């Protein structure tokens, strides 16, 4: 088939597709599918008559190399699919299609996105997967409507791989985009600064390039690629260093100087960011164009050949940026980026010194040793890590390099030793990719935990003054974290000599408080990254700022103690600061519990689990720290511990155990360890549940029959009918709770372990609360509605058995802790406390309702009253059940 026939057939197919699209409609939103037609350009002539009506256009799986400005006439275009073509540059004309909402440009060969791409503010879906991108532009952070972003199978190093996580991209697209935008917005200023310096360096180096073309004619052309050694910072192609080659020279005989084959890079379309020009391989003396070099740092100094990449940049920062130096005696040698030299004269002197060494060691040996030393003692200068390295050209090596005493196996052995060094950056290739990914994630999480991103709250255009105030103090939180880390790293060498055992215990307890609060603070700051509610962020930042102040105060007290000769002089200030830290911890817990749903609803489950574990462990640490702090000072009238009551092991954990959803059980009360009391409690629970089941069954059967006005009394008020129905629903729910408690009792008797006991106490809490709710409502209705005698008798028996169970648990707790019934807890106590009993530990907030006079719980009556004046809930003073009836 001739080319004319092929073109005619293709045009006919396009006309048929256009006609089908017009027939399918709608009139002003045509859908046109021109995929798989082997198109090399857009058929603008055939689409001209409908160009203003096309809303969806598919051009996938063709051979389109570019898209011209004619596409701007497609004013209604909202969906464009140009995947699987041969685009090498992003079409600039697409950046002016403001109506575009969905763009699929995947499976092409695009290496970067233009700056004008940020004008597509209406873009909702962007798929740029399977291209050759190194970086995502920072303006993506300012696209408010972006809902889906597909970037997998690129060579992206900015953002780093643990931010551009493909697993998160598949599981939670909203969180994935939030992470991408947050990272880009935080590093936008750094990226712009480096980009501007890169362009200026390229312009200045272009002048040096022409000057060196006239003077320097003895150096082999080569490229050198170096990446920053500090992988914890953002890496973009703007930060990578490409060194320009100097032009080839000719030998005195007039022939072109030969270049070692190993120093020439192959032209590969899949090479990541290589500016290698094929003319270099043919000995062309023309340097690369400025357009090729305007993004990279340039240096006209002699350089070795660009080492071959050992791994694809798709693996990101988990792998070294260049391959290891070959062991060949004439091969290129790579030097550490940290030891960058900028003076060519220094490099020449270094070459001469190593070439004319008198010890018989070859230059290769010296360079390998220098390379190993540099990696074992890396520089911390970030600027040096991004500069180029002066290299020794292969032609400058003396003849002794070829006849060196060092053999290839010895070089390989040195390389193996260097690779196995724990201080070598290249040793990271020995680790599995999963481990490296976790390490990079931890590095990024550590950075994010030290500073909160500046969020833009679309829902709150006018943040509260307190929020602005807290944002101005975010740097202070970083100083606090640094101070805590510095203190714990230095206490081993600068610790004050301890002469008093009480002081040692107090100081160690205060350190535990400091460490716990600092860890909780960092975990909460990390959790705030997943929250976008301005109210929650305002409240949390306020309490975190208060915690910062208390941490700083405690650290200052520690420093004063270390500087003083007598450490006991500052014991009062340390104790006061420690108690203030505990108060701030309590406030943190209260606010966290209040906004727990907002903090955890959008967060990854691993972060939530880590936060809850830290909260629980911090509560245990603070609880243990209170015991040594209490006797640390002499008891006096104005002593802060004069009214302090020692808390039970379960009172402090109640807060954290509620947050952790009771994953970890609290300590068992001593009563459980007593077989006799244990048996009595189980028998009483069995009696209470049997009694409750009887009366609840009566209520469930009676209430639905009695709440019908035509069956009982037509004068019953509608609100009373609704109350009766509510009583029936509460009774049904209480019946289910009672069955669960009975089943839990059987389980605990079969498997008497600590966790089962804690679950047993939890079910007891639910049982008591349900009986209280039913009893309260029944008592309120007893003055308006006449219950049957059997129902009242059953309620009386159920409340009596519940009261006996409460008495048994309370009396068993008296033997467990005597201090719980001593002096009352002061109002200004750092941790407000419910009286510590096994029941209060199990019931939590329900313990307060048990002591309420409204339900006449026995917990509110002295123990002596139980034996002298037992007035039941549904009986009068004479024990007459009918006395409560109308």
UniProtKB/Swiss-Prot annotation:
Keywords: Cytoplasm, Leucine-rich repeat, Nucleus, Phosphoprotein, Repeat
Single annotated GO MF: signaling adaptor activity
Residue ranges of LRR repeats: 28-49, 53-74, 76-97, 99-120, 122-143, 145-166
Subcellular localization(s) per the UniProt record: Cytoplasm; Nucleus
Chain intervals for the UniProt region annotation (Disordered): 236-288, 301-364, 394-431, 455-483
GO process annotations (BP): positive regulation of establishment of bipolar cell polarity; RAM/MOR signaling
Compositionally biased intervals (Polar residues): 243-277, 312-347, 394-406, 419-431
InterPro entries in UniProt: Leu-rich_rpt, Leu-rich_rpt_typical-subtyp, LRR_dom_sf, LRR_domain-containing, LRR_R13L4/SHOC2-like, RAM_signalling_pathway_SOG2
Main localization of the protein described in the UniProt heading: cytoplasm
Residues with PTM Phosphoserine: 301, 464
GO cellular component, one term: cytosol
Protein name: Leucine-rich repeat-containing protein sog2
Gene that this sequence comes from: sog2
């Amino acid at each position: 088939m001739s080319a004319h026939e092929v073109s005619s057939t293709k045009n006919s197919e396009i006309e048929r597709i256009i006609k089908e699209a017009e027939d399918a409609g709608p009139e002003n939103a045509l859908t046109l599918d021109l995929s798989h037609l082997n198109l090399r350009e857009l058929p603008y002539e055939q689409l001209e008559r409908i160009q203003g009506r096309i809303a969806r256009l598919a051009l996938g799986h063709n051979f389109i190399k570019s898209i011209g400005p004619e596409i701007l006439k497609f004013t209604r275009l909202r969906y464009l699919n140009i995947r699987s073509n041969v685009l090498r540059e992003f079409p600039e004309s697409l950046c002016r299609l403001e109506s575009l909402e969905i763009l699929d440009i995947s499976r092409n060969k695009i290496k970067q996105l233009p700056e004008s791409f940020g004008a597509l503010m209406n873009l909702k879906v962007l798929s740029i997967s399977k291209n050759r991108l190194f970086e995502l532009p920072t303006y993506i952070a300012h696209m408010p409507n972006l809902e889906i972003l597909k970037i997998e199978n690129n060579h992206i190093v900015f953002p780093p791989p643990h931010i551009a996580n493909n697993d998160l991209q598949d599981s939670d697209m909203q969180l994935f985009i939030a992470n991408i935008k947050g990272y880009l917005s935080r590093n936008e200023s750094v990226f712009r600064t480096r980009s501007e310096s890169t362009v200026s360096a390229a312009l200045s180096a272009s002048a040096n390039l022409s000057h060196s073309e006239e003077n320097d004619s003895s150096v082999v052309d080569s490229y050198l690629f170096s990446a920053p050694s500090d992988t914890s910072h953002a890496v973009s192609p703007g930060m990578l260093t490409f060194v320009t080659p100097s032009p080839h020279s000719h030998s005195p005989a007039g022939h072109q100087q030969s270049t070692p084959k190993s120093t020439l890079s192959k032209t590969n379309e899949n090479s990541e960011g290589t500016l290698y020009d094929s003319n270099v391989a043919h000995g062309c003396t023309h340097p690369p164009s400025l357009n090729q070099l305007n993004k990279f740092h340039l240096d006209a100094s002699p350089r070795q050949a660009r080492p071959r990449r050992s791994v694809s940049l798709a693996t990101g920062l988990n792998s070294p940026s260049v391959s290891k130096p070959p062991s060949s005696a004439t091969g290129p040698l790579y030097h550490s980026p940290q030891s960058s030299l900028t003076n060519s004269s220094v490099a020449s002197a270094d070459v001469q010194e190593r070439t004319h060494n008198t010890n018989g060691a070859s230059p290769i040996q010296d360079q390998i040793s220098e390379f190993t030393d540099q990696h074992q003692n890396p520089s911390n200068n970030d600027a040096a890590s991004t500069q180029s390295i002066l290299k020794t050209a292969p032609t400058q090596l003396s003849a002794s390099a070829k006849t060196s005493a060092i053999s290839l196996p010895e070089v390989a052995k040195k390389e193996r030793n260097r690779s196995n060094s724990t201080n070598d950056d290249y040793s990271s290739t020995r680790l599995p990719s999963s481990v490296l990914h976790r390490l990079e994630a931890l590095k990024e999480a550590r950075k994010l935990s030290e500073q909160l991103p500046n969020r833009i709250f679309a829902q709150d255009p006018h943040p509260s003054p307190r929020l602005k105030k807290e944002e101005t103090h975010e740097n202070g939180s970083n100083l606090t974290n640094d101070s805590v880390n510095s203190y714990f790293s230095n206490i081993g060498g600068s610790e004050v000599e301890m002469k008093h055992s009480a002081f040692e215990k107090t100081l160690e307890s205060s350190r535990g408080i400091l460490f716990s609060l600092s860890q909780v603070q960092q975990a909460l700051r990390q959790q705030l990254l997943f929250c976008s509610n301005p109210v929650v962020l305002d409240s949390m930042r306020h309490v975190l700022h208060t915690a910062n102040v208390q941490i700083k105060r405690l650290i200052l007290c520690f420093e004063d103690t270390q500087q003083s000769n007598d450490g006991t002089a500052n014991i009062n200030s340390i104790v006061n600061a420690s108690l203030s830290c505990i108060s701030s911890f309590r406030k943190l817990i209260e606010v966290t519990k209040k906004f727990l749903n907002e903090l955890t609803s959008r967060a990854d489950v691993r972060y939530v689990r880590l936060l809850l574990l830290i909260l629980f462990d911090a509560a245990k640490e603070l609880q243990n720290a209170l015991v040594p702090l209490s006797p640390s000072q002499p008891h006096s009238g104005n002593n802060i511990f004069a009214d302090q009551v020692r808390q039970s092991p379960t009172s402090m954990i109640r807060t954290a155990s509620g947050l952790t959803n009771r994953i970890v059980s609290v300590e068992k009360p001593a009563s459980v360890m007593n077989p006799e009391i244990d048996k009595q409690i189980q028998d009483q629970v069995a009696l209470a549940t049997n009694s409750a089941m009887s009366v609840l069954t009566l209520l469930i059967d009676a209430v639905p029959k009695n709440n019908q006005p035509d069956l009982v009394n037509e004068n019953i008020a509608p609100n009373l009918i609704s109350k009766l129905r509510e009583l029936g629903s509460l009774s049904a729910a209480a019946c289910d709770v009672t069955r669960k408690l009975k089943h839990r009792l059987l389980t605990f008797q079969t498997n008497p372990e600590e966790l089962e006991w804690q679950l047993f106490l939890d079910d007891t809490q639910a049982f008591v609360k349900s009986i209280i709710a039913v009893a309260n409502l029944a008592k309120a209705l007893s003055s308006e509605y006449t219950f049957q005698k059997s129902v009242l008798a059953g309620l009386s028996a159920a409340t009596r058995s519940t009261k006996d169970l409460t008495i048994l648990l309370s009396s068993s707790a008296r033997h467990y802790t005597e201090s719980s019934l001593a002096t009352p807890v002061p109002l200004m106590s750092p941790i407000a406390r419910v009286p510590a009993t096994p029941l209060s530990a199990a019931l939590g907030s329900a313990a307060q309702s048990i002591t309420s006079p409204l339900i006449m719980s026995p917990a509110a009556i002295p123990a002596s009253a139980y034996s002298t004046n037992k007035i039941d809930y549904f009986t009068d003073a004479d024990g007459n059940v009918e006395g409560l009836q109308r």
